């Protein structure tokens, strides 16, 4: 699906001026004039107050703002123009969220996604929209996202952990951008950035953030979004999903042969898809091809102890003063269990204080795990090919209850 679309709409020629900067001719617009014509607010780096009461401002700029839609927001920013940046308005959003309130799955229709951004932008800011040469709109970035499905969240987490050490060729893991449920490759690349992450974890985080807001302070689209995200069927579909996201930038789009002009790209996509192919899926495959070669022949040690974790959590939990359930103690016991699996019963017994070891063993036995089982845990039969869990099935990216979204204007 198209998970992010970044478009740049240049200003009409009559508003664009030029100045010489060294040997470069720089195109720019007068931001104060744009603000007057469109009613937009600007920020000033310097404000000077004179004794006669006059104010002088300099260093005008426009910060990113968010336009509300039915389900989500569209970010936009006015760029004055610079050596490497033609004066324009940049708009960006997740078309999936704008169209349906979530990005667990979604459309690969470039025309529909573009329409969702442009029409909402035009409807919200008609005066600014009229100052732009919409026909010259260019694509700055497309995020193409597809998912592999692990048997459960426990195994999906192990896949992410294994991927942290996978690199190939020019595709390098960006360790500073790796989180517990996310791995990033080539974060600073001007061509494409690749990301793998757990969708169910992200979805739960979004629900938690929205639910923590007082109802009176929630916008109408946040309330709609929370309603959509709380759908049990959606949460069930997201469970076990390992997302592979390609953040594809202009240089990589051009190397694939995609025109950067939005409307030329839409025509290109229509012709391309009419041949029984899918442009967005092939862009995604092209982006991940080098990394996926590293998966060939690779294997990982998989353990499926979700039932054990459930048993431990059902026995060892506490209720905090705020009324929330804490599984801190259960996590320690499960970590001990994983040590038994990886190092063996006798080895762990030799490296822990005797009283602590028996206390942890007793805690696991209380959960219904026989001591004889704890003494004979092994990982030797759990080595499986990595590609078994990195199988992205294009035909099963959406549930059977999916319908192509219909555009709603806020």
Swiss-Prot record:
The lineage of its organism: Viruses, Monodnaviria, Loebvirae, Hofneiviricota, Faserviricetes. It comes from Enterobacteria phage M13. The keyword Hydrolase applies. One of its GO terms (biological process) is DNA replication. Keywords: ATP-binding, DNA replication, DNA-binding, Endonuclease, Formylation, Hydrolase, Ligase, Nuclease, Nucleotide-binding. It catalyses: ATP + (deoxyribonucleotide)n-3'-hydroxyl + 5'-phospho-(deoxyribonucleotide)m = (deoxyribonucleotide)n+m + AMP + diphosphate. It comes from the Viruses. Belongs to the inovirus G2P protein family. The keyword Nucleotide-binding applies. Pfam families: G2P_X_C, Phage_CRI. Its EC number is 3.1.21.-, 6.5.1.1. The gene is II. Isoform G2P plays an essential role in viral DNA replication. Binds the origin of replication and cleaves the dsDNA replicative form I (RFI) and becomes covalently bound to it via phosphotyrosine bond, generating the dsDNA replicative form II (RFII). In turn, viral DNA replication initiates at the 3'-OH of the cleavage site. After one round of rolling circle synthesis, protein G2P is linked to the newly synthesized ssDNA and joins the ends of the displaced strand to generate a circular single-stranded molecule ready to be packed into a virion. Isoform G10P protein binds to double-stranded DNA and prevents hydrolysis by nucleases. Additionally, G10P is an inhibitor of DNA replication and may have a role in the transition from semiconservative replicative form DNA replication to single-stranded DNA synthesis in the life cycle. This is Replication-associated protein G2P. GO terms for molecular function: ATP binding; DNA binding; DNA ligase (ATP) activity; endonuclease activity.
């Amino acid at each position: 699906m198209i998970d992010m679309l970044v478009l740049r709409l240049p200003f009409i020629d009559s508003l664009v001026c030029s100045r010489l900067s060294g040997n470069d001719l720089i195109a720019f617009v007068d931001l104060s004039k744009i603000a007057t014509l469109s009613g937009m607010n600007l920020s000033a780096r310097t404000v000077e107050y004179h004794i006669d009461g006059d104010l002088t401002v300099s260093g005008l700029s426009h910060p990113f703002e968010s336009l509300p839609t039915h389900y989500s927001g569209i970010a936009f920013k006015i760029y004055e123009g610079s050596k490497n940046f033609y004066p324009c308005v940049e708009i960006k959003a997740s078309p999936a969220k704008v169209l349906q309130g979530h990005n667990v799955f979604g459309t690969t229709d470039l025309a529909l996604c573009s329409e969702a951004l442009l029409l909402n932008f035009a409807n919200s800011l008609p005066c600014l929209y009229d100052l732009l040469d919409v026909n010259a709109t260019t694509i700055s970035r497309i995020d193409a996202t597809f998912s592999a499905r692990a048997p459960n969240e426990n195994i999906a987490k192990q896949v992410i952990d294994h991927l942290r050490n996978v690199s190939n060729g020019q595709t390098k893991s960006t360790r500073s951008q790796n989180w517990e449920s996310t791995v990033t490759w080539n974060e600073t690349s001007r061509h494409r950035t690749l990301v793998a992450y757990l969708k169910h974890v992200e979805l739960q985080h979004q629900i938690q953030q929205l639910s923590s807001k007082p109802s009176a302070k929630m916008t109408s689209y946040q309330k709609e979004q929370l309603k959509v995200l709380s759908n049990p069927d959606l949460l069930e579909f997201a469970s076990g999903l390992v997302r592979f996201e390609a953040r594809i930038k202009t240089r990589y789009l051009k190397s694939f042969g995609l025109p950067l002009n939005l409307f030329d790209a839409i025509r290109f996509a229509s012709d391309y898809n009419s041949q029984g192919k899918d442009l967005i899926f092939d862009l995604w495959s092209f982006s991940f091809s080098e990394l996926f070669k590293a998966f060939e022949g690779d294997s990982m040690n998989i353990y499926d102890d979700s039932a054990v974790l459930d048993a431990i959590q059902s026995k060892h939990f506490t209720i905090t003063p705020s009324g929330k359930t804490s599984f801190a103690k259960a996590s320690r016991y499960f970590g001990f269990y994983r040590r038994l699996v990886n190092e063996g019963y006798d080895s762990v017994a030799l490296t822990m204080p005797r009283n602590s070891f028996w206390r942890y063993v007793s805690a696991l036995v209380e959960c219904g795990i026989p001591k004889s089982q704890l003494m004979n845990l092994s990982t030797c039969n759990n080595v499986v090919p990595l590609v078994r869990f990195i199988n992205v099935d294009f035909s099963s990216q959406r549930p059977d209850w999916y319908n192509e979204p219909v555009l709603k204007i806020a």
